[in-house]
Amino acid sequence: MGSKMSDPLVIGRVIGEVVDYFTPSVKMSVTYNSSKHVYNGHELFPSSVTSKPRVEVHGGDLRSFFTMIMIDPDVPGPSDPYLREHLHWIVTDIPGTTDCSFGKEIVGYEMPRPNIGIHRFVFLLFKQKKRQTVLTAPLSRDRFNTRKFAEENELGSPVAAVFFNCQRETAARRR
């Protein structure tokens, strides 16, 4: 039980608010601008996350396929996230041991634009039962529901997740 409580995904309320508790079984790395690695709970500035990151799957093999979802559960703001969740990106059919560029982008990358407070931006990786299990994109980016999407597309529980914090940059902080 002790290890669950110290899990950064539990502390960051990703587990609970976005997905149910799961045991990671695959390693996923997310890197912006080839040098900014995403670590759970660390802060990145909006100016450094404008272009899509490299998301690598360190697991499975070329015959296994994964779906990656990026969401913001803190819209419009973390104190009253009544628009939860906002969908930022979905890539499906990513072969194991490769990265998102080898998959099929069904929802294009949308850069984080947090207006109120500190937002969490969450990357979730799901293992597909087979290729082309996720065929249709959600109708809207607004009020996306990761649990429901995973259920509708038979994705099961996530196999990996990582999140970063991001807040609006003020002119003073940019200097």
From Swiss-Prot:
Q: Summarize induction of expression.
A: Down-regulated at the onset of flowering.
Q: Which GO terms describe its biological process?
A: negative regulation of flower development; vegetative to reproductive phase transition of meristem
One Pfam family, please name it. Answer: PBP
Organism's domain of life?
Answer: Eukaryota
Tissue-level expression: Expressed in vegetative axillary meristems but not in the main shoot meristem.
Q: Which InterPro entries match?
A: PEBP, PEBP-like_sf, PEBP_euk, Phosphatidylethanolamine-bd_CS
GO terms for cellular component: cytoplasm; nucleus
Gene3D superfamilies attached to this UniProt entry: PEBP-like
Q: Per its database record, what is this protein's job?
A: May form complexes with phosphorylated ligands by interfering with kinases and their effectors.
What's the protein called, per UniProt? CEN-like protein 2
Q: Which organism is it from?
A: Nicotiana tabacum (Common tobacco)
Lineage of origin: Eukaryota, Viridiplantae, Streptophyta, Embryophyta, Tracheophyta
